[in-house]
Amino acid sequence: MKIIGMDVGSTTVKAVVVENGQATWQDYQRHNTRQAEKVHEFLERVETEAGVVAGRDRIFFTGSGAGFIAPLCGGKLIQEVVAVAASVDRLHPDVRFVSEIGGEDMKTIFFTATGSGKSKQVFMQSACSGGTGTFVEKTARKLQIPTERLAQMPYEGLSLHKVSSKCGIFAETDANTLVKTGVPVEEIIASLFEAVVYQNLATLTKGNTPMPEVLLLGGPNLFFVGLQEAWRHHLMKLWAQRKIALPEGRDPASLIIVPAEALYYACLGCVEIGKDEAEGVSVYQGRDKLRWWIDEGQHEQKAKAGGRALISGGDDLKAFSIQWDTWRAAATPAPESKATGPVLVGCDFGSTTAKAVVLSSDQELLFSCYALSKGNPIEDAQALFRQVREAGFEDIGGLALTGYGKDLLKDVLGADMGIVETVAHATAALHFFPDADVICDVGGTDVKIMILRQGTVADFRLNSQCSSGNGAFLQGVADRYSVPLEQYAERAFEAKAMPQLAMGCGVFLQSDIVNQQRKGWSAEEIMAALAAVLPINVWIYAGQLQNLRAVGRKFILQGGTHRNKAVVKAQVDFIRSKVPDADVVLHPYSGEAGAIGAALCAASFRKGGAPSKFRGFDTIEALTYTSTTKAETVCKWCPINCTRTFIDVKLPGAQGRAWSKVPLAAGWERVISGNSCPKGLVEDANEMRAVKAKLEEVKREYPNVADMVRKDAFRRSRAEAGVVAGAE
């Protein structure tokens, strides 16, 4: 008799077939949200390849996605931790601590010897992506690191940087900041491995000490060499600090085991438990019921539980497509547009994309380029200016930058202005729509809502520390389903129904997506639901705007996320459901709006008559740079001790800094990043005195309103003071 152990996880399906105590078949594959289909495929294979027979052999299931599948096959469901513990007990009787990291969950098990055997203490994290495989993979995709390279990237010997370990979304933001400051991707990945181990040891040990021997299970622990190195470093350090007695003659590193079968321990545990069950329990009943569920059952259930689709019918899609085409047609520059003199260039170095536009002296758009960030701001700048030059624009009369990378690149490129993002986006919107009431800019990792009064920004809402409602989250989900971003809308519009996703935090939204795919919702249906929930997160969760009617009638949608047709359809429907007579308009250059706003600001510089500081195309193309982040770059001007990065760029005429702790030769200029205040931009006392003088000047020129309000709140009125004085 054969026993099948199958683990249906959040990202993969794994299975083993055991006969007479030996594994005769095993495999694991990603299911891309089609859990039932992948399980059916595995069952078909074990029947043909391993000789499994329905009605004779037995099957046991575990994993987050096995709950509804197991009964359809006649299988019994076993809790994941119980299954893992059973296999560890049999295969590694000396192990006292287990860490299993999965795609979207992680668990730790402490084994303690007792008089009658072993006691087990279990801690799990399943509602947050922090410290899981997805935590690492999402950030690696953002950095455009292939899986094969990621698996071999090291931890040892590299400088580490602060990366949030509590949340995968915050970790992406931290990684993005490090990229924009020029930190090598190798150091960022090593820092991610550090964060994963820290999250496990800080959160899932609950103060207990992982005693040797230690067993590391799950795909991330098996495939990522750097993660194994991080585990060994921290565990050996912990044992030394807590004076844990280690077995004599054993290398401490050998006490941390990563077995070759680390993926299959839950499956093997199912088999171990199944051997002790009565013979009539969990007999495999074949694939017929599962096939019925795939073909009919799941659709019946989804029809009852789901909401309407993004598109209510062919006429709805046709009408919206006509409006979409009208908006997009306005974005086509006239073919005969030519530069007749110096041009204005605006660049927006965002979190996920880099954009550049060229305007004529009369503010006509002549050229634009838009590309996903390569992960390095200087390389992004070189690529953009290469395209500008190839388009024939050599005479630059003004250059302005905006976005996350503006501070780093302003001096390097010789930009005339660095424009705050809200100013750039408001300028771009008002240039095309002077009667706008609200501007909604949804970018890669932030959301900006600007409320206008008489052509000026009266209020704004900014959401930059959460994934709720931003484009990077949509891109991450599309990547997970192996759907090119350009096909997102087409696939989402194919859905005939969609689940109701929870509003709010991106981490919980991710968990909700996993829950919906367990119920059988397809990738297309989940992508449609994600587009539908985005406006709710943008306006209500991020913007805290419950009454859209109160902020105006004309809404301008811009930002790269609004290049997604499905997102715009959801936005239009949501806004008009709240403001029936709303005029919702897509900015003709939604992705390039920030760059256009910067270029328009450069026009004001041009009017002043001063020559541009632009360093020239040849200088930018030939840029050579190095980045340094180590003990000598840590800021010492206050107790926070920011970990700064020194980005040294080779530029003609630069003075260098021979006196620095990190010496800089003549012909090189230093850009400092990673600081949290202006003091972090300087290295010596003389520079600090100049910074302090400027800060004091600002204090004198602009009163501290908060301090004035505080003093006034606690000051008795003159009348009250007089009464008290008379009484005395």
Explain the meaning of each model-derived region.
Residues 34, 113, 118-159, 263-266, ...:
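Glycine-rich phosphate-binding loop plus the immediately following alpha-helix
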Residues 133-138, 245, 256-299, 427, ...:
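Glycine-rich phosphate-binding/hydrolytic loop that grips phosphoryl groups
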Residues 173-202, 511-541:
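Adenine-nucleotide phosphate-binding core of ATP-dependent small-molecule kinases
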Residues 3-45, 118-122, 126, 347-387, ...:
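Short glycine-rich, Thr/Ser-proximal phosphate-binding strand/loop in the N-terminal lobe
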